[in-house]
Amino acid sequence: MKKSILIFTTLFLLTSVLSCKPKTLPVKDIKIVRQDGSEFTVAAEIAEKPEDRNHGFMERKNIPDGTGMLFIFEKDQILSFWMKNTPHPLSIAYIDSKGKIRNIFDMTPYSTASIVSTVSVRYALEVPQGWYKKNGITEGDSILLP
């Protein structure tokens, strides 16, 4: 009986630990082209499904430099993101349907404050905080969309 309880407890704990692992999504290289023609690439997870967009980078403690997450929406709209349950500081670029970066904002870990696009956009690209600034990427630059 004790052996059965031990096996059950071990399996339960193992299942619990594995279910806490952050979900990863398909990755595509996203090219960003600055207005001066310089190009940069981000290995971005693609969040297209509502459940993937809603979860985003929640619970991720480490997001390596040069990686990110591209959120794809069905239509242009005012977008709003927050950092609930997100421990890693991020920067977000709001991108219109033509691939033009319209806004870039830094976001605070765990904050529930809404970071709202100033115009209707179709995409959002989150990267580790400071990545856009470090690479000289600004509003008006373009993303080559997948």
List the predicted regions and their residue ranges.
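Bacterial N-terminal signal peptides that target proteins for export
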Residues: 1-7
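C-terminal motif of bacterial Sec signal peptides marking the signal peptidase cleavage site
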Residues: 16-19
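Compact, glycine-rich, soluble single-domain proteins
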Residues: 21-146
